[in-house]
Amino acid sequence: MKEYKLNVYNTLCETAKSCREIHFYDVCRSIGVKHLKTQEVLEIMNKFIRSNPSYRAVQFIGPKRTSAAQSLFTTLVLTECE
């Protein structure tokens, strides 16, 4: 995995220690990542979920926009489920 993807993954893991709901886009923006391809988002998400099995991936889509117009990068939320 490339360094920038590892930075995102490590930041997600740090955020998971204090938050039950993690907005993927906000975490990426906080470390300076402006965009990721969908495949890269999926790789990071799968690695995070494997290491944190209590989290689930949810895609929040705005009610006034079609799902085709919104990327996984901007809409992915990792939510802790017990």
Q: Can you name each region flagged by the protein language model?
A:
Residues 1-9, 13-16, 20-82:
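Nucleic acid-binding interface residues in structured DNA/RNA-binding domains
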